[in-house]
Amino acid sequence: MANFSAELKKQTKYKAFLLTKRIVEEITQNTYLITFEEDFDFLPGQFCMVSVDGAGLTRKPYTLGRLNKMELAISVKIAGKGSEYIVKTNEKLNVLAPLGNPFIPESNNGAVIVAPSCLAEGIHLSERFDIPLIVASKTELNEKFVKKFKMRVFVGNDEYLNLLSELNHSAFDWIFVSGSRVMEELAVKNMPNKVVYVSLNEYMACGIGACKGCAVETVHGIKHVCTDGPVFRGDNIWQVQRHSD
């Protein structure tokens, strides 16, 4: 099992941070990776809630990442006024973090599959555990950005399905998937004999269990993404028919 004991002991309750954007880089169409001047401690799998008061909206959740094991980062896909504000504002961002439960895998022998909107988290996991990073995107990625990091890129739905069928599942103890619900469900159902973890990206307004907006149905009953997740075993979300060898 990956050793997180020292970091878990250092974990403190979430608090508010004011973050200054260092670089805003377009990864693919309408999707950006933002790095920050400041830093704070968090563990893989955790997320933050970003204030968008300037847009008159509630906070928005984003998974946390770190580039080159140093730079705090998030990935943001512009899907409305709130995310557009986060990308374009010149003001410091008010961020509540770290939130959610950390992802502590049973070994370092895994692989990460993410959509561009979750790429900061994907890079962080890949570098942290020294494991393959695979990006599944509907559109081409910024070539200059791709060259900075070790990743394989698959573009289009057909390419993603081919990836799931051709990936050497037996080489890994686990697969981590973060993207859309459809993307995650396809991974779980196309790899029924593999331990697949999914990082659910659900609407939520608070991130601390108060609003109950992120409730999801699991095989163990209703869970809340912010306090029970955001990372779940995929077969706890979608029932799968396992194949015998």
Short names for language-model regions:
Residues A2-N94:
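Ferredoxin-reductase
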Residues L8, H224-D245:
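Short Fe-S-cluster ligation motifs
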Residues D53-G54, P98, V219:
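Short, surface-exposed secondary-structure boundary micro-motifs
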Residues Y85-A205:
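FNR/FR-type flavoprotein reductase catalytic core
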